[in-house]
């Protein structure tokens, strides 16, 4: 459900997407998010996420996309650690929830995500719904700080017409967008 920033797709959607993408030798990253709204989850929602992770792995997802924050918009280390056993060592991507983390704490968050085993962070570079070009300097700062320890994937306003310029200006390794293809 893109209207709320993405939620966990149905069993059937994951199954069909995996079949289709794997035929084309493209990897599948499955969003694990039980609802729209904020990224603060209670115990019941964490159990739902554990089950969804197990189903996504069973259906041959190649990556899992998660975004868990505390009430004060910091990485929910405890919640992530609860989910880790169910991930079965699949590569983990931190959702654009990263943009809700205060700018002053984002470098610490990168370190925490590296320590938790995440391989990629999806970010717009700002919690504001602004033009991504306004965030180029901050995105470059994040890419430089990550220094290859974790991939910074830029998103939110990336198109087929601008992704190459954004990659060049930020140094990001990858871009994400519904308007790239």
Where are these regions (language model features)?
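Glycine-rich phosphate-binding active-site loops on the catalytic face of alpha/beta enzymes
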Residues: 1-6, 55-72, 116-132, 158, ...
